[in-house]
Amino acid sequence: IDLTLQGATLSEESIREHLKSILDMDLDDGITWEMKSISPIRHDDLYGGFRVKLNAAYEKIIVPFSIDISTGDVITPAPQDFIFMSRFSPNGNFRIKAYTVETIMAEKIEAILSLGILSTRPRDYYDVHMLLSTVKYDESNLSKALHLTATHRDSMDTIKEWSEGLKLIQDSKTM
């Protein structure tokens, strides 16, 4: 799970504090949580981030997963509200703010073009293909999101040369 904080301090202590208050909530759903670790990520990013490793337990089922938490990413045009229906809790639906599909695609396209043949993320190719072929999106917002993402990540020169980058990927024997 990726999480972007807006208007909040990003530190190991603040993350531990906020997550503890969330994980300690009794939702009467039978799920218990254990925070395993918090470690820094995105060392090359101006804003950095943290990876939180957790275990969720439901009866005898234990599911390990991680949350990557960062701040400073550009969300274009703005975060959207999504309503999700709980499968476990009788309390029903819950709302979250999430990236727009255009921002998700922009980040994946930027990663594909920036990393090129050095990419170790085949899921980005799959995700872009699936999103382009199954989800409605606004081309103008995608263009804006890609421009802002590349500017934020200081990769605009690479993005401007996208056709050469795609040719290298296409001709690669390892991709």
Question: PLM features: residue spans?
Answer:
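Compositionally biased terminal segments of proteins
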Residues: 1-175
